[in-house]
Amino acid sequence: MSKVITKYDLVGDTLVLILAGGRGSRLHELTDKRAKPALYFGGNRRIIDFALSNCINSGLNRIGVITQYAAHSLLRHLQTGWSFLPQERGEFVDMLPARQQIDDNTWYRGTADSVYQNMAIIKNHYKPKYILILAGDHIYKMDYSQMILDHVNSGAKCTVGCIEVPRESAKEFGVMAVNENLKVKAFVEKPSDPPAMIGKPNSSLASMGIYVFNAEYLYETLERTVNSPQTSHDFGKDIMPMALEDEVLYAHPFDRSCMGRNTEGEIYWRDVGTLDSYWQSNIDLVSKEPQLDIYDQTWPIRGNPVQAYPSKFFYDDPACKQVDNSLIAGGCVITNASISYSVLFDNIHVNEGTLIDESVILPQVKVGKNCILKRCIVDRHVQIPDGMQIGVDPEEDSKHFRISSKGIVLVTEKMLQKMKGETVKSEDDLD
């Protein structure tokens, strides 16, 4: 009798590669000095912590993180927060920066090329049987081992994670059609007119940017792709169509491996690639029963929280509304200020008479007296002067700050320096 394969049999043969080199240009100044996966999220985590935590919780302890753009803060975060795996047991989180292996002027030319340039290390050092490719810039909880098991049981050589999205949103994703066995029959990357799902005219089946490959098949397709004159060096544009043509591409619906559904049974996956989506995903966490439960200890999201004293709240003015429906990280000092429906990261000082509403405040911000901040994202190290009002007058805000399509105001220290006519100081990337 042949042995029944379980997901626990497969994780040791799998190498995870997290693609974390992207800038996230739609986040504008928020990613000027940090890669998108290194961006703060949820009060005391970074975006990449979700992919990394999913790996550890799934039993996947052989992880390579591919970096390129503005990688310093990301590398420091990985070194200080994710170096606990015992290498003597073959477990690791290795960093794979762009090393210009093609020539001295060639950085990673795309997602597929970032793996191709590390292929010698992958083949000769890690020697995996399966390779799991992840984007490092999405917010979700997922048991990857279930996807790997489905990949093996289906006989696929490549499996792509998929999720149902509104058709009008599908232009930003790869979109596919599948048969009753989840074999992919059509795939198009970022279509201008996304095809609808059968029987669901307002929905499309979108790629999550998560792939499982048989390692040998991935090596073969990367070699074929890099030698093609029409290549974009991209998984969605090149590798997926190739696997489709080879008839070895299958889909894995996210609802088969999603961890931590909400009380309505809904699954949660977010691409926080715009100012609006980043703001909304943070603000969602302050609700009584958020779709994403960051307090769930059955599937914990690890990170590298700052060592800080407990936050301090001082109120001797009974007229102050104080704090409600908000997340406040450690090291904050709140004095006679009203804070509602907001996320404050570590070591933020808010002075008396100030009102903060529906705002995301990144670490080490100082807010002066009698300020108003509404529907803002305030970047790290910003110092808001006394009496400043942001998010109140859109016309005035537009003169100095960036305003998103939905009216969210992004505030950076450089913007404030320009507003005050000061010399713009160079910023380090020790984020």
Swiss-Prot record:
UniProt keyword Flavoprotein present: no
Family annotation (InterPro entries): ADP-Glc_PPase, ADP_Glu_pyroP_CS, GlgC_bac, GlmU/GlgC-like_hexapep, NTP_transferase_dom, Nucleotide-diphossugar_trans, Trimer_LpxA-like_sf
One Pfam match: NTP_transferase
GO molecular function: ATP binding; glucose-1-phosphate adenylyltransferase activity
Superkingdom of source: Bacteria
Substrates-to-products reaction catalysed: alpha-D-glucose 1-phosphate + ATP + H(+) = ADP-alpha-D-glucose + diphosphate
Stretches that traverse the bilayer: none
Keywords of this entry: ATP-binding, Carbohydrate metabolism, Glycogen biosynthesis, Glycogen metabolism, Nucleotide-binding, Nucleotidyltransferase, Transferase
Gene Ontology BP annotations: glycogen biosynthetic process
UniProt key word Membrane: no
Pathway membership, UniProt: Glycan biosynthesis; glycogen biosynthesis
SUPFAM superfamilies listed in its UniProt record: Nucleotide-diphospho-sugar transferases, Trimeric LpxA-like enzymes
EC number: 2.7.7.27
Binding sites annotated in the UniProt record for alpha-D-glucose 1-phosphate: Y108, G174, E189, K190, S207
Oligomer status and interactors: Homotetramer.
Function: Involved in the biosynthesis of ADP-glucose, a building block required for the elongation reactions to produce glycogen. Catalyzes the reaction between ATP and alpha-D-glucose 1-phosphate (G1P) to produce pyrophosphate and ADP-Glc.
Family named by the database record: Belongs to the bacterial/plant glucose-1-phosphate adenylyltransferase family.
Listed name of the protein: Glucose-1-phosphate adenylyltransferase
Organism in which the protein naturally occurs: Actinobacillus succinogenes (strain ATCC 55618 / DSM 22257 / CCUG 43843 / 130Z)
